Amino acid sequence: MTERTYLAIDLKSFYASVECMERSLDPMTPILVVADASRTEKTICLAVSPSLKAYGIPGRARLFEVVQKVKEANLKRQRNAPGYRFTGASSSSVELENNPGLAIGYLIAPPRMAHYMEHSTRIYSVYLKHVAPDDIHVYSIDEVLIDATSYLKRENITAKDLAMRIILDVLRTTGITATAGIGPNLYLAKIAMDIYAKHVQPDENGVRIAELDEMKYRQLMWTHRPLTDFWRVGKGYEKKLESIGLYTMGDIARCSLGAPTDLYNEDTLYDLFGVNAELLIDHAWGWEPCTIADIKAYKPEASSVGSGQVLECPYDFVRTRLVVREMADQLALSLVESRLVTRQIVLTVGYDIENLTDKTRSKAYHGEVKVDRYGRKIPKHAHGTANLPRYTSSSVQLMDAVTELFERIADKNLLVRRLNLTAGNVLTESAAQKEEAVEQLDLFSLSPTSQEKRAEEEKKLVRERKRQEAMLAIKRKYGKNAILKGMNLQEGATAKDRNGKIGGHKA
């Protein structure tokens, strides 16, 4: 088997860098956060600039965390200011470094997702000048994975040379710098980029390039903490592993070597994670058999379509029901647009912390309590599934099903903050027709009354389908808000506002 070489390239603080360039600022020096300040300070920041990260602010902080961290940094800074007083403020890290009498200020840039997508498309066209599309996997809006094997041999260059060539071309074209990881498999390339590159000194353009092979990975990464820094290891995995005394990738690798009679062995991991333990063990050793060709060829056996939203403020039962119906309606249109159908709806309702912080509400609640990622106590979320009698993309049928499901699983007395709605068991319309063609009929379904009822139902579905397709045509031509339903204009409805967003952020 041919040894392969992969590159992982991540555009540095992409959203923040785009906003800096739009203001004719060097992306490395301004103190800037991309966030919708028109919402509450609980809003999630889409990105923070490298200079702002230097104050201990993570990339996906909430706006109030930025405010708090900057306030703390200014208190420390004031102790060293001449006369213990600030003479002004600046959002430039260069000015702040040269003048201790300035307070830390910061710019807030509202998100512009459509604009960022245009920039991402431009940058992808730069990649295509160096690499064929078959050798690129777009991992996210600001990250790609590249199989560089054939290019290194053909052009007689190193992987670092190719990575630098691509990154400098992006820098010249857009002004945005990047970080790269190099490895013999996709996993090691990504870990080199995500973790190891952070310890590499940047060059004069702010570029960091790091390289890992299996042995170097084991030497450098086996003791690295936290585990959540590693690809595909989330808080849940970390918590389970730490509960049995495994804190590092080295611990996981050693665990996998244990004999059946040992306290720790691979069965310990399989008991915790099922078949996913195999991937975890492979990654602990720095192995990854999947190639970009495999990714390109992959077709999922089953699929789902869904959406979620965080409400801008806590919603009561009645207003939440309206939003759930809006989500079901939008889900139906998404299915129609993709020529898909479903026969299963899955709904998750996440409750607000006010249910436990408000004394009156807290006394009235006697259910299970969970702790969220911020360490706050909240009522346990509600979760349920509704199976439909047949495959459908009907807005009427999906709204009726999700309304019934919501009323069945949601606590009428609790305030809601998060909603997730998913259509499961999704098939193409043609595949569903074939499956339903062999549906077993019973004696009652053959009666004249039953057949007439079914024929009338089919007519209604055909009429509704024509309305849905007409709505989609209008939305495509004139915008998502060009045609709305009455419920979208009711108090508390969110669809109209969400139509102007991409990924929950302003377009």
Question: PLM ranges: what are they?
Answer:
Residues 404, 408-465, 470-473:
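C-terminal hydrophobic structural anchor segments
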Residues 184-187, 282-283, 341-353, 415-427, ...:
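A glycine-rich phosphate-binding loop feature that marks nucleotide/adenosyl-phosphate handling sites
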Residues 145, 387, 420:
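Short aromatic/hydrophobic contact patches that present stacked aromatics
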Residues 12-14, 38-40, 352-356, 426-429:
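Short, charged/polar surface micro-motifs in flexible loops or helix N-caps
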Residues 1-285, 289-292, 443, 449-507:
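Gly/Gly-Pro- and Ser/Thr-rich, intrinsically disordered tail segments characteristic of DNA damage-repair
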